[in-house]
């Protein structure tokens, strides 16, 4: 069965196994998610569960938002996302971190850190030119075909805005779950800055 939960990235730390092996982990705080809506093939054309995370202040929510969460008997939520192919949940039910177990393989989605306007070396990993001996080519993007094509091709790697993209890292392992603190420890790094929204769901390629 597919599992899914929303949380916030706290940061990174490290833990040790009983054998003394060091494991770098990312700490994700996932307070209980509330099921706001259950979508079915008959009514919506597909099966999905809509969940909400992080209570929103009453002043910041409008009447439609309050009406939407009224059936779940909960406060309006800051983040609302859908998980497909999750069964056995009803409106108002809570999804907690103990849904997952140590050893589960998951896909983690977040928004990468924004870096602003960057050049081709930082943005695309291109090599620079010689820095001396009369060279006038240092950190520029290189030839763009000004003569033969007489135009710049689409998808040419150029300088521009870097980061701030939706990124998914697949097949990460859950090292530990701490239900009393609503915390999940995931092996390795996950995309996003501290306090950013993180989506954790069962890996689609697990075992492949």
UniProtKB/Swiss-Prot annotation:
<dbReference type="InterPro" id="IPR019927">
    <property type="entry name" value="Ribosomal_uL3_bac/org-type"/>
</dbReference>
<comment type="subunit">
    <text>Part of the 50S ribosomal subunit. Forms a cluster with proteins L14 and L19.</text>
</comment>
<keyword id="KW-0699">rRNA-binding</keyword>
<keyword id="KW-0687">Ribonucleoprotein</keyword>
<keyword id="KW-0694">RNA-binding</keyword>
<keyword id="KW-0689">Ribosomal protein</keyword>
<feature type="region of interest" description="Disordered">
    <location>
        <begin position="123"/>
        <end position="147"/>
    </location>
</feature>
<dbReference type="GO" id="GO:0022625">
    <property type="term" value="C:cytosolic large ribosomal subunit"/>
</dbReference>
<dbReference type="GO" id="GO:0006412">
    <property type="term" value="P:translation"/>
</dbReference>
<protein>
    <recommendedName>
        <fullName>Large ribosomal subunit protein uL3</fullName>
    </recommendedName>
</protein>
<comment type="similarity">
    <text>Belongs to the universal ribosomal protein uL3 family.</text>
</comment>
<dbReference type="InterPro" id="IPR019926">
    <property type="entry name" value="Ribosomal_uL3_CS"/>
</dbReference>
<dbReference type="Pfam" id="PF00297">
    <property type="entry name" value="Ribosomal_L3"/>
</dbReference>
<comment type="function">
    <text>One of the primary rRNA binding proteins, it binds directly near the 3'-end of the 23S rRNA, where it nucleates assembly of the 50S subunit.</text>
</comment>
<dbReference type="GO" id="GO:0003735">
    <property type="term" value="F:structural constituent of ribosome"/>
</dbReference>
<dbReference type="GO" id="GO:0019843">
    <property type="term" value="F:rRNA binding"/>
</dbReference>
<dbReference type="InterPro" id="IPR009000">
    <property type="entry name" value="Transl_B-barrel_sf"/>
</dbReference>
<dbReference type="InterPro" id="IPR000597">
    <property type="entry name" value="Ribosomal_uL3"/>
</dbReference>
């Amino acid at each position: 069965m597919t599992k899914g939960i929303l949380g916030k990235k706290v940061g990174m730390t490290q833990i040790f196994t009983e054998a003394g092996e060091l494991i770098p982990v990312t700490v994700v705080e996932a307070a209980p998610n509330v099921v706001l809506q259950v979508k079915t093939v008959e009514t919506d054309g597909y099966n999905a569960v809509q969940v909400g995370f992080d209570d929103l202040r009453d002043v910041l929510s409008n009447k439609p938002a309050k009406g939407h969460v009224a059936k779940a008997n909960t406060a309006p939520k800051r983040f609302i996302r859908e998980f497909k192919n999750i069964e056995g949940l009803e409106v108002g039910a809570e999804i907690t971190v103990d849904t997952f177990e140590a050893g589960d393989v998951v896909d983690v989605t977040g928004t990468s850190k924004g870096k602003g306007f960057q050049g081709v070396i930082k943005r695309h990993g291109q090599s620079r030119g010689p820095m001396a001996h009369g060279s006038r080519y240092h950190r520029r993007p290189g030839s763009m075909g000004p003569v033969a094509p007489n135009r710049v091709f689409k998808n040419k790697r150029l300088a521009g805005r870097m980061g701030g993209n939706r990124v998914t890292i697949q097949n990460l392992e859950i090292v530990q779950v701490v239900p009393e603190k609503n915390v999940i420890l995931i092996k390795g790094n996950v995309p996003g800055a501290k306090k950013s929204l993180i989506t954790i769901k069962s890996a689609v390629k697990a075992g492949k």
